[in-house]
Amino acid sequence: DEKSHQRLWLNRSFFDERWSRNRCVTSLDWSPQFPELLAASYHHNDDAPNDPDGICLIWNTKFKKTTPEYIFHCQSPVMSTTFARFHPNLILGGTYAGQIVLWDNRVQKRTPIQRTPLSASAHTHPVYCLNVVGTQNAHNLISISTDGKMCSWSLDMLSQPQETLDLQ
């Protein structure tokens, strides 16, 4: 059968010696606005205790660059990442500490411009799933954590969830 002889070929690897060495990838997401951009979140590097625990690298698959397009980091390993649909410059991360962080690629800083509080009203365990749902004019960020909570957030106000559902 001709189909059984089809093979996959490695076209390209995305690796940065400084930022992705000894880190496992925890999440991937393609940009809905810029299909050539791929966000990859990474866990901490045990061999580099002075480096940030959480990293999110934005790779450009269109150009043959050997370095990420953007480098973002935070104080906790990033377990999930997503591009903010309807906001082409915003990238969200769900952390091991239970926080959600927001990066903006227009700002000349690698740390989050906004983050959720460490609070019992929000997540208290790792955030493994993030998704922006809704329409251009009415949308929310949905987050799910191993604490059994699903939270709904406004991207304009990450100080507290708009709604929390206990899934247990």
Question: Which residues are covered by each model-predicted region?
Answer:
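Structural core positions within WD40/WD-like beta-propeller blades
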Residues: 38-39, 91-92, 142
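Loop/turn segments within WD40 beta-propeller blades
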Residues: 30-35, 81-89, 130-139
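Acidic and/or Ser/Thr-rich intrinsically disordered tails and linkers
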Residues: 1-58, 111-117, 148, 152, ...
